[in-house]
Amino acid sequence: MMTSRSIVPQQSTDDVVVVDGKNVAKGRNRQVLGDIGNVVRGNYPKNNEPEKINHRPRTRSQNPTLLVEDNLKKPVVKRNAVPKPKKVAGKPKVVDVIEISSDSDEELGLVAAREKKATKKKATTYTSVLTARSKAACGLEKKQKEKIVDIDSADVENDLAAVEYVEDIYSFYKSVESEWRPRDYMASQPDINEKMRLILVEWLIDVHVRFELNPETFYLTVNILDRFLSVKPVPRKELQLVGLSALLMSAKYEEIWPPQVEDLVDIADHAYSHKQILVMEKTILSTLEWYLTVPTHYVFLARFIKASIADEKMENMVHYLAELGVMHYDTMIMFSPSMVAASAIYAARSSLRQVPIWTSTLKHHTGYSETQLMDCAKLLAYQQWKQQEEGSESSTKGALRKKYSKDERFAVALIPPAKALLTGTESA
């Protein structure tokens, strides 16, 4: 706010200024802040004779012009006065704050009134009570948000677990898994069909068990087999040779002590020679451009089983369903490895009556909801039911059923599938 300045009233043309020389002389020795006595204002008669000045002190009530004279004196006094040091800018004056914030205070008061009104407890009506009871009866009330379990907390000190990067690693696996999926190749294979492929994969499961190989080796073997068949026609008589060479390559890649070529010749009952296996191995590698580092089903199974917090029985059930899905051509073509792995978890939890079937932790780490998994999970449950029906009618068991019917694997192949996945209903 700027300081208001006094406006000097314009002198009338009738005013006469009389200068007293005596007072002027005295003004040279006048003290600071002294009275300026050499200016006298007033109206005089037309004969230019000044009226006699009354030397009695006049008050402001007797002569209002003294107020103007006081205002005239102030600038002169300030001009001759010793300049005061400049004041450092400080807080605004109280008057200014009051004037500026007067409107805002009213606004704050209105806001406070609104907030107070909003915080008032709403009156509970009979209709709202009935609505809440109806929702509770129908199970429509909001469930408390389930907490996501930190499945890597126990592996913080394990450098091989790569806890800092594990989330990024699996995000990368999911982003590239579709690049290495085999396409639908049966139409381009004149001599083989889906049944022949199923027989070959089940035979590879038996060979895998006999050599006591790691699970990674089996899933990589099937991946190499399907990728090769999707780009190169193979005669029926060489189909088993392709499977043997794919197994040899996978074992060299995954195992510390892979089986020898002679062992593969023996297990194939000398149907193929040592040289034929090595030549086919070279043909497959050149066809696939030596690219063997791919995200297989096992890569996702290892992570998803950990997220499921599964015991040994659950883990064997998951592997049984996953291998069952890999055996069937339609499952391999229709669904990605991560989808099959997640669906195997869902179908296994359904068969073993785990509650809840699908948790927030599983949804977070798999990236799939129950709705997304339902088609693949139903297909796995149907294949599980069909294998059990065929096994009960036949005197011999298939390699997969035999493998998972043992007590050391909790005989998970004998556990019936969940009825909910077979009938399509929500209740098991």
Swiss-Prot record:
Taken from the UniProt entry, a GO cellular component term is: nucleus
What family is this?
Answer: Belongs to the cyclin family. Cyclin AB subfamily.
Q: Does the keyword Protein biosynthesis apply?
A: no
Pfam families per record:
Cyclin_C, Cyclin_N
Localization terms from the record = Nucleus
| Family annotation (InterPro entries) | Cyclin (IPR039361), Cyclin-like_dom (IPR013763), Cyclin-like_sf (IPR036915), Cyclin_A/B-like (IPR046965), Cyclin_C-dom (IPR004367), Cyclin_N (IPR006671), Cyclins_cyclin-box (IPR048258)
Q: Origin organism of this chain? A: Arabidopsis thaliana (Mouse-ear cress)
Q: How does it assemble?
A: Interacts with FZR2/CCS52A1, FZR1/CCS52A2 and FZR3/CCS52B.
Signals that turn on the gene: By auxin and nematode infection in roots. Down-regulated by salt stress in root meristem and shoot apex.
Q: What's the protein called, per UniProt?
A: Cyclin-B1-1
Q: Which PROSITE patterns match?
A: CYCLINS (PS00292)
